[in-house]
């Protein structure tokens, strides 16, 4: 009887230990995912803001030889320069986005669909910006009615410093919602 009681107590203690370990492991997993997601989310959003920065510094333009400067029409040169600048700026988004998408897949598996849908909204806004940039750069190449004047895209693309920036406000709203939903998982 003593052996049975001892084995029963030992089994109970072992079971409680495994349960505690499992809870700690899940808490650590949630914490690591939440931390990684918030870091990648902030890098992603900051990269979007950098794309929208109205200042284009001299170092961002492509290096060209003097011969190229004389052989290219001004509109074509301006088009190529803008494409180069925005492609380089967008590369930062392309570099961080796969990590964020990986986080979103993990979030969907562990925490459900709610956050995934918010990330979809954020990715849709970034895609909208991408299309606007294409239209903006094309406006330098095509000086006809098909494309608007480049200045008409300014408020959508480079409005990053104006107080009434609806695009930035929408991104910040989604970012805040995501951060608020992730916050509870940052507790160990």
Q: Which stretches of residues belong to each language-model region?
A:
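Membrane-embedded hydrophobic alpha-helical segments
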Residues: 1-24
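Terminal, low-complexity, charged helical segments
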Residues: 5, 50, 113-114
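Membrane-embedded alpha-helical transmembrane segments of multi-pass integral membrane proteins
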Residues: 6-9, 42, 127
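Transmembrane helix-loop junctions and nearby membrane-interface residues
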Residues: 11-18, 47-54, 132-136
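Short amphipathic alpha-helical/adjacent loop interface patches that line ligand
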Residues: 18, 41, 175
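Amphipathic, membrane-active segments
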Residues: 22-63
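Interfacial loop at the N-terminal end of multi-pass membrane proteins
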Residues: 55-68, 76-81
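An amphipathic alpha-helical interaction surface
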Residues: 68-74, 84-188
């Amino acid at each position: 009887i003593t052996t049975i009681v001892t084995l029963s107590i030992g089994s109970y203690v072992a079971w409680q230990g495994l349960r505690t370990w499992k809870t700690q492991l899940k808490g650590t997993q949630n914490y690591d995912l939440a931390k990684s997601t918030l870091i990648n989310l902030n890098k992603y959003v900051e990269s979007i803001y950098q794309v929208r920065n109205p200042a284009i510094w001299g170092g961002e333009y492509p290096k060209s030889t003097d011969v190229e400067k004389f052989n290219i029409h001004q509109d074509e040169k301006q088009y190529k320069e803008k494409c180069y600048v925005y492609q380089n700026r967008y590369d930062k988004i392309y570099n961080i986005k796969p990590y964020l998408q990986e986080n979103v897949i993990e979030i969907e598996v562990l925490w459900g669909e709610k956050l995934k849908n918010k990330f979809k909204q954020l990715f849709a806004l970034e895609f909208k910006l991408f299309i606007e940039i294409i239209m903006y750069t094309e406006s330098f190449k095509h000086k006809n009615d098909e494309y608007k004047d480049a200045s008409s895209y300014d408020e959508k693309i480079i409005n990053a410093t104006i107080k009434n920036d609806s695009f930035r406000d929408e991104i910040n709203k989604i970012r805040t919602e995501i951060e608020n939903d992730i916050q509870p998982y940052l507790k160990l």
